[in-house]
């Protein structure tokens, strides 16, 4: 890394007019709340929680866990996407809780927490493709563009930044299946629910 420190490529380009493959590990991407809210509205038609406009976040930044550099300033920690922002989960659950009959003022019980987690990751599983769809190109198209020797200067760097954002979104998408598996109801719970429904 240079003396500018661990900056994502979008900041490097904006501040200093260049990009670097070494900084790709620090890349970030913003997910606007309106995409998330739209996804929630499609899935939940019941009464949803209302957010305080002054406290709600209008967008959330996704980033990798990049670790800290060692004493020599070199970072050998593998950069990896390991979590969505906590504030994002809180805001989503605040909205979907009432639609799932969860009293968010009292707080969810253990079973409800699990249900909320599952619903949250199902929402994010739909949000990421929606965010990717906002770009005019795919990862593969950007990679092809960067192979073109005629693509120069700031245009090339802008494509490089855009590609870095998409790669991070794809990593976030790949992180989700394990979370869905972790929070999905056990088979016995499902069978118990279906037995209760049949009794009714």
Q: Residue spans of the language-model regions?
A:
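Charged low-complexity "KEKE/polyampholyte" interaction tracts
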Residues: 9-11, 15-200
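Short, charged beta-turn/beta-strand-edge "cap" motif at the junction between a beta-strand
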Residues: 1-11
